[in-house]
Swiss-Prot record:
Record membrane topology: Multi-pass membrane protein
Main location group: membrane
GN (gene name): chrA
Family recorded in the similarity comment: Belongs to the chromate ion transporter (CHR) (TC 2.A.51) family.
Function: This protein reduces chromate accumulation and is essential for chromate resistance.
One MF annotation (Gene Ontology) recorded for this entry: chromate transmembrane transporter activity
Superkingdom to which the source organism belongs: Bacteria
Cystine pairings recorded for this chain: none
Protein name: Chromate transport protein
């Protein structure tokens, strides 16, 4: 579609005077610079980021009406991807067509990407083992577990709205602990919930039994070939494979960036690209940056494949966030109105919550084994979790990570 045709996406002034708000006239560089500023100020996670966008672009400048913004937010919360970034892309399209959407999305993500890229490079220039900095990162890793636990709670509050969604989440968590692949549990969870919403309980039971049978068949087939597969995939990190890993995570981030954690970890740690300790360090670094937390994928890509790997992973993770708005701009609101599709996505999202819970247990076990003192590690975890709930501020994550690093430096000297 040409840029001229894309301008038709903008409502007319007459429409603005009667029913709808309109973005102000601006050039493409001005649009990019505006969202670059938002990216530089994107502290505090999605809630703070969305609040910033709402305050400036809805309440103050009326790029879009409050009612339509709320509906747009509801759509973005159903679809995979970081909501704040997707809203930026959508508003960029509203202002200057699809090219405007690309520029708005790039502006919002670029500061976080460049900062994480620089930190990833610095991470490998510094000695950690047996140093005070290594000890500080042990403290930080305990705090990261607290961040994930709080995220599971907050995401679950918005997704697990009835008993069946709770059941799906618990079953998917148990299945993940039992090493059942997500490509079995998540579609099954979505189908089962959609059928239950339609009151087709017999069909839901059949889908459940089919999923159990498939999981058993895969387990039986995989058992004799597991060592062969492990030998093939261990350490391999081609650019295409890194990109595919990021794309998979980007397509499955229902409910926020934290939901990408189990999928990225499954590939990065499972394939031998990095250790769990490095994975937790990447999460910690992303927590102190003005960016969507999913920017930790840049660090994972850097560890797996250097600078090119960092770019490949980042492109893969963010591609769905661009694509949904760019391709389906006019039809996104229909997602909320389609009850069957909405129910399926709700079931998948509930399953993802279960996967995060299972991954949190795994990461907590790894951290417990790494810290020199389990008591001190648990104390840092408990203090960080309590602070996150007690202090409602967009910088609370940054403060917790820095404080945990200081605590690790003080109590785990030369233990990194």
């Amino acid at each position: 579609m040409s840029v001229a045709n894309e301008e038709s996406y903008r409502p007319s002034k007459a429409t603005d005077a009667t029913t709808e708000a309109v973005p102000p006239p601006m050039s493409y560089p001005q649009l990019f610079a505006r969202f670059l500023k938002f990216g530089l100020l994107a502290w505090g996670g999605p809630v703070a980021q969305i609040d910033m966008l709402r305050r400036e672009l809805v309440d103050e400048e009326r790029w879009i009406s409050s009612k339509r913004f709320n509906k747009l937010l509801a759509v973005m919360q159903v679809l995979p991807g970081p909501e704040a970034h997707e809203i930026c892309v959508h508003l960029g399209i509203r202002a200057k067509g699809r090219l405007g959407g690309v520029l708005a999305g790039l502006g919002f993500m670029l500061p976080g990407f460049l900062l994480m890229f620089a930190l990833s490079w610095l991470y490998f220039q510094i000695e950690f083992v047996g140093t005070a900095l290594g000890a500080a990162f042990l403290g930080v890793q305990a705090a990261v577990i607290a961040l994930i636990v709080r995220a599971v709670h907050r995401i679950g509050e918005h997704i697990l709205l009835d008993r069946w969604l709770w059941v799906i989440a618990i079953v998917c968590a148990l299945a993940a602990i039992g090493r059942v692949d997500f490509w079995i549990t998540l579609p099954a969870g979505g189908l089962v919930y959609a059928l239950l919403v339609l009151n087709h309980r017999a069909s839901a039971l059949l889908v459940t039994l089919a999923a159990v049978a498939l999981a058993a068949a895969v387990a039986l087939w995989a058992a004799p070939t597991a060592k062969l597969v492990e030998a093939v995939v261990q350490g391999q990190a081609s650019v295409l494979l890194i990109f595919a890993s990021g794309l998979k995570a980007g397509l499955l981030t229902f409910g926020g960036a934290y939901t990408a954690i189990p999928f990225v970890r499954n590939d990065a740690v499972g394939r031998g690209w990095m250790t769990d300790g490095q994975f937790l360090d990447g999460l910690a670094l992303s927590g102190v940056l003005p960016a969507p937390l999913i920017i930790f994928a840049t660090f994972v890509g850097y560890v797996a494949g250097g600078p090119i790997g960092a770019v490949a992973m980042t492109v893969g993770v963010f591609l769905p966030a661009f694509a949904f708005s760019l391709i389906f701009y006019d039809r996104l609101e229909a997602v909320v109105e389609n009850k069957r599709l909405h129910a399926f996505l709700d079931g998948v999202a509930a399953g993802v919550v279960g996967l995060i819970g299972a991954t949190t247990i795994d990461l907590a076990q790894v951290t417990a084994e790494r810290v020199p003192s389990l008591t001190v590690g648990m104390s840092i975890f408990a203090a960080g979790l309590a602070f996150l709930y007690a202090w409602k501020n967009k910088l609370n994550v940054v403060v917790v990570i820095l404080a945990a690093g200081l605590a690790g430096w003080l109590v785990f000297p030369n233990q990194g």
